[in-house]
A protein has these predicted regions:
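Carbohydrate-interacting/catalytic domains
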Residues: 2-170
């Protein structure tokens, strides 16, 4: 939830796997369910580092925390919409409940058009979500000439692979 628009949805202890056994009402319980197990901090350093990196990535990219709702259209005639949805094919999202795939491309040129943000153009950012229990592929959209996709390895599991754009699959 750190890379979605709006307020990041993270609760104390989430950064090291303190799940409260899935109980979303643990705040009103004065027992082990609601207590923070600080031992998890030393057991789950990898998750903590991942969360720290995700926070830094979000801070570095203003297009990921816009002060206004994204529209999904190219309302400033920049050549791309502010946000677009993708699936197994670039620019085509399957809305079937069995798909369980979502690719989102944010266009950073819109970040600099907002009055309350610094005047610095952000990157194209593509975030792929696979909610399926099996490995699935997403397609990358083409970028403008002279640009290419780069991956942030920190956010990829060892099973995932990524290819260059041009409708190729990741």
């Amino acid at each position: 939830m750190l890379l979605s628009q709006g307020v990041p949805m993270i609760y104390h202890g989430d950064e090291f796997g303190n799940s409260q056994s899935g109980n979303n009402n643990a705040y009103c319980q004065d027992n082990a369910t609601g207590w923070t197990d600080w031992k998890g901090l030393s057991r789950n350093q990898g998750l903590r580092e991942f969360v720290k990196d995700a926070i830094a990535f979000r801070k570095a990219h203003p297009v990921l925390h816009m002060p206004v709702e994204l529209k999904g259209v190219d309302y400033l005639t920049k050549g791309f919409p502010d946000v677009s949805l993708h699936g197994e094919r670039a620019w085509y999202l399957s809305y079937e409940n069995t798909s369980r795939l979502l690719g989102m491309m944010y266009y950073g040129a819109y970040a600099r058009e907002k009055e309350d943000l610094e005047a610095a153009e952000d990157d194209f950012i593509y975030i792929g979500y696979n909610f399926h229990w099996e490995n699935r592929s997403l397609a990358l959209p083409n970028l403008p000439e002279g640009m290419c996709w780069k991956k942030n390895r920190r956010y990829l599991s060892s099973r995932n692979r990524i290819l260059s754009g041009g409708g190729r699959r990741i």
